[in-house]
Amino acid sequence: MRQFSTNPYRQSPNQKFACSIANFKLYTVFPFSLPSSQVNISTFAFLFSEVVQYNQQRVTSLAQLHEKLADLGRHVGFRMIDLLCVRDRAPKRETRIVNILWFIQKTVWKTLFGKEADRLEQATATEATYYLFEDEPLVNKFVSVPKEQSSFNCAAFMAGTVEAFLCGVQFPCRVKAFLVKEQTTTAFEITFEDSVIERDKRLEANK
């Protein structure tokens, strides 16, 4: 596979974004005395670009590389559950699909990337599928992809994060990331298992 070129310093070195990949242990020990952790965006860019190149050298296809990045994202997603529970003195357990997706769009996204996800939509063809859209995801800003590998999307890492978070809070699903709108916007396709849809219908009927 042809290696991707990276530019971790494309953004200003002084620009920062909220990121909870680091310092989970510190928040577990001192949950209410520490400020929100922030990572310099250039540091994150350098680290993430190295992760992409490291995994690229150990796979033979883009599908395998996507799965490698998704696996790494899943580790973050599971830890986000613990982090947000520790930060919230009275955590609320969401039981409805729309509510948990709103929570991801707003709270989880802002905790990880310093902003809310751009929009959330439900598929018209099936009630089990939703789409979370992000215009120019942060992880895609630092990797230049060759034309012959234009389907590669670093946001597979973010898809793994969302999938693990949802599965960890009892909303089993599969999440895939793909590019739309001239390869700048990423859509995260969230497909819930039938058991989740059936539970949501029961809760709606018992309102």
Range-by-range predicted roles:
Residues 112, 116, 169-173, 177:
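Long, hydrophobic, amphipathic alpha-helical segments used as structural scaffolds
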Residues 119-122, 164, 176-179:
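Beta-strand elements of modular eukaryotic interaction domains
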Residues 157-172:
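Mixed-charge, glycine-accented linear interaction segment located at domain edges/termini
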Residues 175-193:
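Beta-rich nucleic-acid/ligand-interaction surfaces
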Residues 1-154, 182, 195-207:
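N-terminal accessory segment detector
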